[in-house]
């Protein structure tokens, strides 16, 4: 798959990004290089290879789940203009 300048402009338009003509030409080359690398990765034989979740063989340390109030309710509502019992108070918007 290769990207041409019209594809770059179309994607930029869809993303609502302003792209100049010279930037679009530069991006065309960069995107084609990226897609070429991805195509190389698709050719790698990974049959029998276990998926990795980390590059190190460490296991995640587990801790016991404890239900708490978090202890920061007052800090969370500290900058709110109006609060009541550590809750935000907002104007009624639905009748």
From Swiss-Prot:
Keywords of this entry: ATP-binding, Ligase, Nucleotide-binding, Protein biosynthesis
GO BP field: glutaminyl-tRNAGln biosynthesis via transamidation; regulation of translational fidelity; translation
Catalytic activity: L-glutamyl-tRNA(Gln) + L-glutamine + ATP + H2O = L-glutaminyl-tRNA(Gln) + L-glutamate + ADP + phosphate + H(+); L-aspartyl-tRNA(Asn) + L-glutamine + ATP + H2O = L-asparaginyl-tRNA(Asn) + L-glutamate + ADP + phosphate + 2 H(+)
Top EC class for this record: ligase
Pfam families, per database record: GatC
EC number: 6.3.5.-
Example of a GO MF term: glutaminyl-tRNA synthase (glutamine-hydrolyzing) activity
InterPro entries reported for this sequence: Asp/Glu-ADT_sf_sub_c, GatC
Function according to Swiss-Prot or TrEMBL: Allows the formation of correctly charged Asn-tRNA(Asn) or Gln-tRNA(Gln) through the transamidation of misacylated Asp-tRNA(Asn) or Glu-tRNA(Gln) in organisms which lack either or both of asparaginyl-tRNA or glutaminyl-tRNA synthetases. The reaction takes place in the presence of glutamine and ATP through an activated phospho-Asp-tRNA(Asn) or phospho-Glu-tRNA(Gln).
Quaternary context: Heterotrimer of A, B and C subunits.
Family per record: Belongs to the GatC family.
Protein name: Aspartyl/glutamyl-tRNA(Asn/Gln) amidotransferase subunit C
Species the sequence originates in: Brucella melitensis biotype 2 (strain ATCC 23457)
